[in-house]
């Protein structure tokens, strides 16, 4: 665990959701707290990169430190700001809106980091639209080329990753990458968790 630091990005505008996604509760737990608790089970230190640390100070966030983000400039710049504080070889990068994230999957991925080829700067899930940059692992040495890309005006994770070697992370199930971006997404995830909750008494027909 000492060789892994986690960065959680909580700097999005949440415009499609209409409220701060990080504070939306699923099964009574704010999403940011849920993601950070999982990150803390895999990493010694968890950095939360956000322009609004005061919004989240009341949450239960073990082993977490805030990195104030200079405005909402997008996830790539937020990652670069967090990466500047990292001392470990590997960093786990997570978005704050992953309600189906599973700790055992991240721990298994982390346990296999030693087998990632030396030339790879990251190991990430891959899907039809490209890499999933906000749920995976990066080597700290990706910082110089990342900063160069940003200084040249780059803001896209996908465009940056095209220029580097990245190893594919095997997904046990694609649903762990589910993002809670809209009220419809929230309704879906809350409905699924409600279905999993035990019902102490059967519902009467016609009630």
Swiss-Prot record:
Its EC number is 2.7.7.77. Its cofactor is Mg(2+). Keywords: Cytoplasm, GTP-binding, Magnesium, Metal-binding, Molybdenum cofactor biosynthesis, Nucleotide-binding, Transferase. This is Probable molybdenum cofactor guanylyltransferase. It catalyses: Mo-molybdopterin + GTP + H(+) = Mo-molybdopterin guanine dinucleotide + diphosphate. CDD domains: MobA. Gene3D superfamilies: Spore Coat Polysaccharide Biosynthesis Protein SpsA, Chain A. It comes from Trichormus variabilis (strain ATCC 29413 / PCC 7937). Belongs to the MobA family. It is found in: Cytoplasm.
């Amino acid at each position: 665990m000492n060789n892994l630091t986690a960065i959680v990005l909580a700097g999005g505008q949440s415009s499609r959701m209409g409220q701060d996604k990080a504070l939306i509760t699923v099964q009574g737990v704010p999403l940011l707290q849920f993601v950070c608790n999982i990150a803390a089970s895999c990493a010694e230190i968890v950095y939360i990169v956000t322009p609004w640390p005061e919004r989240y100070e009341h949450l239960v966030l073990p082993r977490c430190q805030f990195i104030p983000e200079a405005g909402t400039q997008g996830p790539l710049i937020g990652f670069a700001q967090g990466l500047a504080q990292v001392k470990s070889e590997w960093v786990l990068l997570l978005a704050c809106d992953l309600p189906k994230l599973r700790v055992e999957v991240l721990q298994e991925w982390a346990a296999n980091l030693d087998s990632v080829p030396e030339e790879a700067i990251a190991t990430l899930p891959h899907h039809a639209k490209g890499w999933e940059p906000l749920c995976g692992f990066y080597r700290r040495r990706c910082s110089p080329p990342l900063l160069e890309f940003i200084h040249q005006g780059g803001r896209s994770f996908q465009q940056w990753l095209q220029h580097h070697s990245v190893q594919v992370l095997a997904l046990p199930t694609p649903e762990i990458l589910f993002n809670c971006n809209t009220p419809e997404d929230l309704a879906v995830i809350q409905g699924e968790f409600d279905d999993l909750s035990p019902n102490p008494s059967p519902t009467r027909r016609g009630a």
